[in-house]
């Protein structure tokens, strides 16, 4: 019994319990690949994916997940144990994974607007050309050249 008591005490200490922060109040650390915004280290709060650090969108109430981002030096970011650790963004990764859907929606919207504009200009040009085709028709042009109007005949007399 005396041997089990220290083991039970270790299990009951909140600093030694790991979990995902999903709400029972006794969890103090986030699982690997996630971070917590709240301070001090024993505080309880939501866990966020590491991909959300320096993503241009503040997820923490105080914006600490965006602190030190975009500098030439290695930025310091909050970790699950409250200390700050340097991080280097992954090379060639401009947008976080959660924004790729928005990016494709934006690209699709811009392309659709361009297609509608080009189609509208083409339809307008076609209608203008159709309305001018009777003015420049071969039959009316040859008739005007062969039989001058009275007004044109008066000019020569």
UniProtKB/Swiss-Prot annotation:
The chain crosses the membrane at residues 103-125. Residues 20-102 are extracellular. It is found in: Membrane. Disulfide bonds join 30-47, 37-60, 54-69. SMART domains: LDLa. Residues 1-19 form the signal peptide. Gene3D superfamilies: Low-density Lipoprotein Receptor. CDD domains: LDLa. Keywords: Disulfide bond, Glycoprotein, Host-virus interaction, Membrane, Receptor, Signal, Transmembrane, Transmembrane helix. It holds the Pfam family Ldl_recept_a. Residues 28-71 form the LDL-receptor class A domain. Residues 126-157 are cytoplasmic. Glycans are attached at residues 20, 24, 81. It is a single-pass type I membrane protein. Responsible for susceptibility to the retrovirus subgroup A Rous sarcoma virus. This is Subgroup A Rous sarcoma virus receptor pg950. The lineage of its organism: Eukaryota, Metazoa, Chordata, Craniata, Vertebrata.
